[in-house]
Amino acid sequence: LFSPDKRYGTWRRLWVALARAEHRLGLPVTDEQVAQLEAHVDDEIDYAAVAEWEKKLRHDVMAHIHVYGESCPDAAGIIHLGATSCYVTDNADIMIYRDALLHIRSELVSVIAALCDFAYKYRAMPTLGYTHFQPAQLVTVGKRACLWAQDFLLDLDELNFVIDNLLFHGCRGTTGTDASFLSLFDGD
């Protein structure tokens, strides 16, 4: 999930989405160029070539653009057209974070379900309850497990809130302004 292949593969998917959108919006991006990007989106990434390009350019995103462009030469000129680096870096990270949070949520739901089963199974088994770390009165193991589950349910609510409010950063031009896109679209 947090591997280089996942991160840079997501960059490639974002470049395909950008090219597809730019084509639909009338920029000089052809169906053939988009198809070529799509055909090579899952190709193995040549990290040695990326390192060489990065050494020359001193720019990680541009290094990946060049390496991806080598595998789809007809589309090389439209990869990342008009976008800022943050379009791929930040949005890919958000997509990866979302995948991670969804995985955590799935595991958390499993823990809650297991605690519910445990609470039901031990609903009548007595145990000593405590207050302020002092022995107080009898409770059941099942009740105690319900309290643990309640804490996890609160965590689940917060996790759902974060997932629901994790926003894609959109697409901006170079330096985070719209200047490059305004230029590409002749000021419109």
Model-derived features: where do they sit?
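A helix-coil-helix interface module used to build multimeric assemblies
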Residues: L1-D188
